[in-house]
UniProtKB/Swiss-Prot annotation:
Top-rank taxon, per record: Bacteria
Gene: rplF
Subunit annotation: Part of the 50S ribosomal subunit.
Swiss-Prot/TrEMBL keywords: Ribonucleoprotein, Ribosomal protein, RNA-binding, rRNA-binding
Regions annotated as coiled coil: none
Disulfide links within the chain: none
One cellular component (GO) term of this entry: cytosolic large ribosomal subunit
The keyword Transferase belongs to this UniProt entry's keyword annotation: no
Name the UniProt record assigns to this protein: Large ribosomal subunit protein uL6
Amino acid sequence: MSRIGKKPVALPKGVTAEIKGQTIEVKGPKGTRSFTATDDVTLAIEEGAVKVTPRGLSKRARQQWGMTRSMVENLTVGVSEGFKKELEIQGVGYRAQMQGKTLKLALGYSHDVNFETPEGVTISAPKQTEIVVEGIDQQLVGQVAANIREWRRPEPYKGKGIRYKGEVVFRKEGKKK
């Protein structure tokens, strides 16, 4: 039995949900998001909360039960508060700046890396060594942050590179003479 799926998803103030068949559409102050659930679960709005129930006791139905409930919760958090990923840049000469909708990264290559901001996400660089990725879609925000980090992952010897804020990089000792 799914313990996650049992809890109903409360709708915060200013957020409305509408169910059409297996699709739930959530509207809030930051925008609108929708999600289509599989046929293994049913969606219902009861007393200002979205309730997800399985259609059977098969293994797949129980898996989809918890996953669907988590997805609905992510929709409500996204349209009410939004999601945010912060990145730090460490290294001599490594820096980031915004030029319109393009993030320009100087990461020690012979050329600057230009990263176009995708639709549905806002990228900002409050400092030269900080990048903030924000949006209402948790998966898209995380993927964009991972794509930026991929240009120069933190290396274990000096710790240079792009890392998530608060990420601990495993450090290695250099060669001994």
